[in-house]
């Protein structure tokens, strides 16, 4: 998808995701999970709200929301920062390490990060949804972007079970604790039986 145009807004992004999920769910034999990290968690909630309203296919077994506090929390305006400021921000938050700092990789990533950030920054829920679906909230205890009081708001976004799963590193714990993150997601069926 790297050669495709950037999404203009959250509506466009979520409509694309919705269409892809619909195609996959129609062919799937098993229940599915819907999730995302940071901006992706907000997008997952927006897509799930759309699935519920349209009733074209079943709701996910659960939503996996990682690296996101309150859905209506104030967002840092990353899209208006200079390239060096974006790089500094991502290094500080733990999102860049190793090979990702190579110049060619940065030239590829910075425009994507800026465009995605703009979509996220310009979006807000008119009213945060409360959905009839289980949720797994994955977070880092060391992430300044997800204060405890905001994490507790996820209890208001579901009429069903909300499971909190802590990690240790930083906002990008899915990169730094990759194996544990993957193992955790694989084991969610133990908690959510649909």
Where are these regions (language model features)?
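Residue in the alpha/beta-hydrolase core beta-strand immediately N-terminal to the catalytic nucleophile
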Residues: 33, 37, 62-64
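Active-site catalytic motif of lipid deacylating hydrolases and related acyltransferases
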Residues: 1-32, 69-85, 167-171, 191
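Gly/Ala-rich beta-loop-alpha elbow adjacent to hydrolase catalytic centers
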Residues: 36-40, 44
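Flexible "cap/lid" loop of the alpha/beta hydrolase fold
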Residues: 49-88
């Amino acid at each position: 998808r790297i050669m495709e145009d950037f999404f203009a807004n959250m509506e466009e992004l979520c409509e694309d995701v919705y269409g892809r999920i619909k195609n996959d769910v129609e062919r799937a034999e098993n229940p599915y999970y819907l999730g995302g990290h940071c901006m992706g968690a907000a997008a997952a909630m927006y897509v799930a709200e759309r699935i519920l309203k349209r009733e074209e296919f079943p709701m996910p077994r659960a939503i996996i929301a990682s690296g996101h506090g309150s859905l209506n929390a104030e967002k840092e305006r990353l899209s208006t920062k200079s390239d060096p400021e974006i790089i500094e921000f991502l290094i500080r938050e733990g999102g860049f390490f190793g090979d990702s700092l190579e110049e060619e990789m940065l030239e590829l990533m910075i425009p994507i990060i800026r465009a995605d950030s703009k979509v996220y920054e310009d979006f807000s829920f008119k009213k945060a949804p409360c959905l009839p679906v289980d949720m797994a909230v994955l977070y880092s205890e060391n992430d300044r972007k997800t204060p405890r009081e905001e994490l507790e708001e996820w209890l208001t976004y579901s009429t069903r079970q909300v499971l909190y799963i802590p990690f240790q590193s930083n906002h990008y714990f899915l990169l730094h604790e990759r194996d544990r993150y993957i193992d955790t997601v694989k084991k969610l069926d133990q908690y959510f039986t649909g």
